[in-house]
Amino acid sequence: MSDPTTPANQPEHQAPAAGQQPTSQDTGATDWRVPGSGIAPLRHLATSPRDWANYVAIGDSFTEGMSDDENVTAGDWSGWADRLATMLANEHAGEFRYANLAVRGRLLADVAGPQTDAALELVAGATGPTLVSIVGGGNDILRPRADIDALASQLDGAVARLRATGADVLLVTPTDPVGAPIIGATRGRVGQYIAHIFSIAGRHGCYVLNQWDLHFLKDWRMWAADRIHMTPEGHRRVALAGFAALGHTEADEGAFRHPMEFASAPKPTWAEHREWARTHAGPWVKRRVTGRSSGDGRSGKLTELTPWPMG
């Protein structure tokens, strides 16, 4: 009998025929607004590592890599996903390929829609086991009228489609916004969404990178000047946490969980708060009011599976 915790296990849905793209209609995606609709049998979170030959990252600015300017080899930024790809490549004996379809400012509808469609095409053409990481929903949650149950339905549909191909999936939770200016008010919505993420992961046998549990992210030095995106050190530690979430015990927890020296971690001053509001919060609000996005006109930095590391 197979082990239900093994990520190689297929979901409870029937896989599509060769060359056919699975859709949310034929993968048993759950509509969280309709009690009892499409409820799949409870599975378990995936915890055992695999030897992946390919990694596809989809998401928003976090997965694009803002604001990690260390060792940039693709696009404008490096980021946790690029760093994780390098770690996974080091675990793989043969050629490793990586694609990053994430675009700053994207809502979950784009991540679970067009980006997932593109990821499915890459998975279909890939040779060897493939991992797909999904980050999305954070930009939606910032909106006061965000429907968390509707977001969960979108995410569940994307996960179901990807798992139906046999690809493994790493879901990434939002961070805990406690104490953060303005976005701290979203903490309740964030907690509700994270509960959905764990439920979805349990049903489909996914890995989970739980950023809510990463207490080092409460250190302001992990965050860039905009207080939305991470510094290179923040991305480095999250990549290590992701590697550990994928079952790699070689990722020494002390390497990313141990706090930095407290004495050099001053809290922002009121003057810095005012400067942040002027240079970052104000423009962000203006984009929301005018219906624009920082990612307008942009595409992912690696839209094809590319040998990795580059260079």
Language model segments and positions:
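Cell-envelope and extracellular/periplasmic
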Residues: 2, 102-106, 136-141
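Serine-esterase "nucleophile elbow" of acetyl-processing enzymes
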Residues: 3-104, 117-128
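Structural motif
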Residues: 54, 130-133, 168
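Alpha-helical scaffolding segments of alpha/beta enzyme cores, especially the outer helices
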Residues: 150-164, 192-199
